[in-house]
């Protein structure tokens, strides 16, 4: 069971790390709460997408054409909006 969880986590991590090559990532990524979405997730649309921080991006972890929209920065990922 632990091996399966590690495998699934690694697959999601690799998919998100290489997602900048995907044209339609805004519809495929993991949604996150932007500051502009409101105070809670109940009934609010999650308009951000979680991006994994990689070496090719700037200090904010968001790819070119996207901007940071979350309340705080994550250790390995940021909530970004196109």
Curated annotation (Swiss-Prot):
Propeptide residue intervals: 20-26
What Pfam families does the database record attribute to this sequence? Toxin_4
One GO MF term: sodium channel regulator activity
**Signal peptide range in chain numbering:** 1-19
Subcellular localization is given as: Secreted; Nematocyst
> What does the record give as the function of this protein?
Binds specifically to voltage-gated sodium channels (Nav), thereby delaying their inactivation during signal transduction. Causes death to crabs (minimum lethal dose of 25 ug/kg) and mice.
- Recorded protein name is Delta-actitoxin-Aeq2a
Taxonomic source organism: Actinia equina
